[in-house]
Structures are given as C-alpha cells and as structure tokens.
Amino acid sequence: MEENIFVIKFINDDRLYQIPLNIINKYPKSYFQSIIHFTNKFECLIETYTYEEFSDVYKYMIEDNFSMQNYLRNFCVLDYFGLNNIIYDELIPTIKFAENRINEFVSKNTYIYSTTIEEYFAYKRIFFDKPYIIPVQIVNVRSDGDRDKYLLFAGNGDLVDFGYVNTALSNDMFLKKSFLKLTDKIPQGLPFDFIRGVSIHEFERYLSNNQIESDYYLKFKSYMCTNEMTDKTYCNEVQYILNGIDINMSLELRGKYYYKNGFFSCKRLNENLLNKYIDTYSDKNTVTYNDDIISLCGKFFSEHKNLLFENMPVVFEDSVCDEYSAEYSTISHTTKISVSLGFINVKNVSDK
C-alpha cells in the first residue's frame, strides 16, 4: 500500500476510496487523522456508512468547488468524520451576520428581501410561527416600446396589486378595479395576462364568451394565461409565479408574427432553468394569512411604492428576445421578467 495514500473501505463491499495524504492532512481533527495517529495505519473500515453514502464526503474532500448547498445538506455526515472544523471559521461570521439581520427585522425593521430562492424558503421556515411576518413576491416586467409593469403578491401567492411603474397610484387603482369588477374570483392567470398586454376589453370578452367553441374563439382563448392556468394546483407561491411566467413567455413566443420577407428569430433566456426551479421548489405551505394582514401589506406598498422597484435582489429572471432582419435594417424587441422575494413585518408597520 502506498504510504502517500489513505484507503477507505466498507463492510461487505470490495469498493474503496483512495485519498492523498496531503488532503487528509488539511483536516487535523478528522477521524482519518485519528486513525493515522493512534494506529499508524493508512486505511480504515467504515461500518456506519455505505460506499454510496460516503461519496459526498469524498467529493467534499477532493473537489475545490463543493457548493455551500451541498455542504449544508451533508453537514451531519461531514461532522461525523470531523471535517467541519476548518469551514466553521468561514461560516460563523456569515451565520452571525444573518442572525443579526433577522433579529433586526423581527424587532424593528419593516421589510427584508431574499437574495436567492433557497434563502426565501429558509426565512419562511424561520418565520412560520410569526403570522405578522408576511411573504411578498414581486414580479417586474420591462419591455421595449411599452411601459414597465409590476405584479405584487403576498402570503401564499395572493394577488395584492398590479399596475404600471412610475404612474400615479390612482391610475393603478382604476386599472385594477376595472379588471376585477369583471369577476368575483380572481383567475390565477389574470396577472400574467395583464403583463402580456391583454386589455380589459379582451379579458371581458374572454369571460363573457367562455362557452363559445368557434374556431376564432378557441384560437383567442389559447392565447390567454387565464385559460392555461385554470384549475391548476400549485404547491406554493414560487411554483405558481414561475409557472405563470413560463406560460406567459411560451404564449409570447407562440404569438410572434413570422414575416414572409426577411429573417425572424425568437428565443428565451432561461427556459430550462425556470422549468428546473418549478420542479425543485415544491415545499408545502404551512402558514395561512388573514385578509386584514394581506390588506395591510398592500397599504404599506401603496405608501412606499418605490420599494417595489428599487434595490431589490432578483432571484430569477427570464426574457424573450425577437429580432427581425430585413434587407436594410434589423429590428429587435426584448421583454424581460424578473422575480424578487421578501417579507413584510406588518407589526412594525402598524407601530410606525
């Protein structure tokens, strides 16, 4: 056996791992260093984990790009083999910073934004027993040649508000009331139809002619997010919003006009990543929020509308870009949709 290699074996398994000693030496308090120190041997037999279960430990020791997400998922097994000591020094300042940020938010701040979807769900688990802390989900839409739009959801994906960026609040309220007076229950696809540019009159026609089966109407109906999302069930608000964006973008592509003369191309930026997210984030919701608190959340943003658009970390972004090349010119058009996630402490809002 080579003395510069440490061998790891398993019960009832001929397979083994070989780890260079220079890597083992990076972990002076590890289980493997103890074997070397007390037995003067460069191999060990693992009884508590299988070859497959040990694979993440091996990757952690060998690979330089082992992600923090994988580290946290395998924390217990890494701790079992004494491999956490070095990273503690890096984690502790990060954990203390996050802890201070959370404590300040709970005690005195009114809002906090997440930098990733994973962080959003982590915060949601932390705040699950505090019904006065409301998750908020914000969708911003920027499109060449059109006014920027926004959607505001709260709680488990309840629609709070929608409208145009940089317009008077009274105009937004008129727009929202014009849409919502057409139906008793807000269809799941309504906000995503709005950001696609479906007009109030088109939405009214959809609702009033929903039983018509003519070729024209069936084609018209097929371009409605409301039609695509009717009766769908979502595990949580993130799945709902990402699926709405996916349908929105797909309809955007489907509705593009292909010119006979010239060249037309159309593509999406993050379709594969979006579909992966939709499948990944399926945590069940465990908290319900009453209408009064949702209303208070909407009132807060109506008084601080700038918070819907300024300095918000974006956790997901997708775009549709189409380009038409004619003989003498090229015309391009991009629609970009971004998602931000955070929390409002309505107790601190009401105290101010």
UniProtKB/Swiss-Prot annotation:
Lineage top rank: taxon: Viruses
Protein name (record): Uncharacterized protein R652
